[in-house]
């Protein structure tokens, strides 16, 4: 449903509960993993569009950008504007340290993905942020800040994206509907319906 909001005779914004954007933050260091995820995400989007009767735009990096804009600014704007943010934190390198006789291994994701994930965690509700990685990685091997989030595992045969994207989109729909309800119940403001 599309709602147009007008306050004091000034058009402010539209609230559209049928169009959504899924942004994929991927790494190119282990391309087969990103390729699996990309295909999983796109397949999930097609299923959800049909099942939920919504439009879902798949987006990533500086895709569909015109001209010579600064890539990092474009990506940050896309992250702020997306409805679901998916970060592929597939480890691309490892650090080994020794503490006495004990060896510790830390697996590190792509720094660009880590930066984009941190920005998304700042801008978006965590219900709209999905952190994915290959199966078989223990939480203790990841950087500290990743260990305290729900991580979604995948492999070549397992596509967790259908359910995860659907849950995040349901959260977006509820949030948008609640926003419209607040605006409608405010007697000083006027809401226009299509």
For each feature predicted by the language model, list its residue ranges.
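Short glycine-/polar-rich loops that comprise or flank the Walker A/P-loop
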Residues: 20, 82-83, 124-129, 146-149
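Conserved N-terminal substructure of TIR/SEFIR domains
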Residues: 5-84
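Nucleic-acid nuclease catalytic cores
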Residues: 125-141
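C-terminal interaction surface of TIR/SEFIR-family domains
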Residues: 142-194
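Arginine/glycine-rich "motif VI" loop of SF2 helicases in the C-terminal RecA-like domain
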Residues: 50, 119-127
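Conserved nucleotide-binding/hydrolysis micro-motifs of P-loop NTPases
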Residues: 29-30, 93, 136-139
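TIR-domain catalytic/interaction hotspot
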Residues: 62-116, 122
């Amino acid at each position: 449903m599309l709602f147009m909001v007008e306050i004091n005779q000034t058009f402010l914004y539209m609230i559209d509960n049928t169009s959504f954007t899924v942004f994929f933050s991927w790494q190119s260091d282990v391309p087969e993993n990103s390729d699996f995820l990309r295909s999983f995400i796109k397949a999930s989007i097609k299923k959800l569009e049909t099942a939920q009767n919504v439009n879902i735009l798949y987006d990533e990096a500086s895709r569909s950008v015109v001209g010579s804009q600064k890539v990092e600014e474009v990506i940050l704007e896309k992250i702020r504007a997306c409805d679901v943010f998916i970060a592929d934190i597939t480890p691309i390198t490892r650090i080994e340290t020794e503490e006495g006789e004990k060896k510790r291994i830390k697996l590190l994701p792509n720094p660009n993905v880590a930066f984009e994930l941190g920005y998304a965690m700042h801008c978006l509700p965590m219900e709209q942020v999905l952190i994915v990685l290959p199966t078989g990685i223990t939480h203790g091997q990841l950087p500290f800040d990743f260990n305290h989030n729900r991580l979604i595992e995948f492999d070549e045969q397992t596509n967790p994206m259908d359910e995860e994207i659907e849950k995040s989109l349901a959260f977006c729909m509820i949030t948008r509907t609640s926003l419209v309800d607040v605006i409608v119940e405010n007697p000083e403001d006027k809401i226009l319906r299509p």
